[in-house]
Amino acid sequence: MLKNIMTKKLGRIGEIKNLREIWANEASDFTKWLAEEENLNLLSEAVGVDLELIKTEADVGRYSVDILAKESNTERKVVIENQIEPTNHDHLGKVITYAAGHDASLAIWIVRDAKEEHAKAIEWLNDHTDDSIGFFLLEIKVLKIDDSLPAP
């Protein structure tokens, strides 16, 4: 009976650890990619909120948030800060500054790797704000099967 079982060749899934191999520049490559409708829809699925792009590099005083969006059915503002590196204190401050500057109801921080202390800070913010404000910390991973195109 074992002789009748066909052996199937399977590919290997691998993770691309250096996201800069895919998006060399965070602002001009990753943010531009994420702001495209099909990719913003992927983010919408991940957070459970329908997002519509308002603007990339939206001003907040002397600074600018990577993506300013809105929730489709409520018009609530959403700020999206990208960091294709491990989390750091600087970007945590940016997320809060941009959310305040745009009176956003949701703040989404997309990172390569979330350090435990920053994940706890986001959890603390969610625990100590009311239900009208929410913070998301998402890790982006890029995978490949053998020689296939990379997929987020």
Task: Please report, for each region that a protein language model flagged, where it lies by residue.
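Charged, terminal alpha-helix-loop-beta segments
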Residues: M1-P152
